[in-house]
């Protein structure tokens, strides 16, 4: 192990491992897991609504699918994007008239783990989060909100995970999803937005800003909640997420 430094000048380590490529990578994976506290979780069989309904998932569609998905032997049924009012307004939309707690209960009563899609580190311009609390998002040098990407027909902004109001926002979203509604599996999407370049409340490494956000999620959700990262930074997620979508 050699001493090294990151781009910001902070100390780091280089690891030199001799041997065939596959053996080296296997050992490197073990070393990373041990260093960062990697989580060892049994693989899950998950049915995700996205690939059948995209944003068209609804309470009625869910009720049709639940018995079929259970019969096929899936352990988890995860509701994907489309359930919410808007990205940044994390309440049940019109298509889930009975609410998300009722949806989680129906999935659980069918013998499966209820899962939910959320994008905790981004919000759309028209959302209440952006309108009411613009200070909790990453900014540009000119003081405007930094664009993290484009989807849903327009740009979206990235949460500043170093800012105390953003901490409150994330904790409320995760606590509601897990402890009030009863979802014990979360698909966390677009989470690389936490690491975009820009001006933050505290100027820390972008990787640390990302891990700060994930720590908020993990600490609030608890160790028993399965966290899947989508659009995730793979190595910085070790020790905080249970799995990462790579396809």
Task: For each feature predicted by the language model, list its residue ranges.
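Aromatic- and carboxylate-enriched substrate-binding clefts and catalytic-loop regions
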Residues: 73-247
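Carbohydrate-recognition beta-sandwich/jelly-roll modules
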Residues: 1-72, 76
